[in-house]
Amino acid sequence: MAVLLDPEIGMPLNQLGTLCGRSNSSADAAFFYLLCLSAVHPFEGAKDNLQILFERNEKRFLELTKQQTKNRNDKASNREIRRFLVEFLHVAHQLLESNNIGQIQESGQQTLNDFNACMFYQNDSILSDDLVFKLLSISMMLVDRILRTRSRTVKQTILFAGIAFAVALFSHVVNHAIIRLQNAFYQLHDARTKTNENDSGEEEERRQ
């Protein structure tokens, strides 16, 4: 309610992030913390909360790296999506703190590949439209944070990487939107064709 009354104040957004806890592998919380820091009147405590979130996520990322060779062929959709979310937050953390552009680009590309694969999961998938919106928003807010917080010596290079990551993420979403629209049109066409065939068959039977 406080957010609706005065969206320029960041504190309620920080509280929403805290309430989200580890929902969607902490991606929901990261969204609200970054949104809080992007507000006209940010709540500075969100920085610490975001840092704690990133540190916790790094531990999970290292665990996933150790298990990668063992579980890479696991096709359980939600497990794949949770792993992607951990990778996504790892890239976000790198964009805000790492100076290793090569590592950022490598991690970013792997994360984008996994995102593309996860977007093909539709039935009973935890990668909902709401979550995709939050991920896209995070990618844009990361660019804003890079502009505000990174040092001049690395800002331009990291900024380029952040923009490239956000644009690629958007392009994957647009591509999958087109694929799903095409599939919907094909299904509608097939349903109409089948209905017409049934109607023709019934009419033929009546004539006989």
Where are these regions (language model features)?
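Conserved structural position within tetratricopeptide repeats
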Residues: 3-4, 37-38
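Extended alpha-helical solenoid scaffold regions that build the rod-like backbones
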Residues: 9, 61-208
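Boundary/linker segments of alpha-helical solenoid repeat arrays
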Residues: 10-13, 38-52, 61
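Alpha-helical solenoid repeat scaffolds, predominantly canonical TPR units
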Residues: 5, 13, 32-33
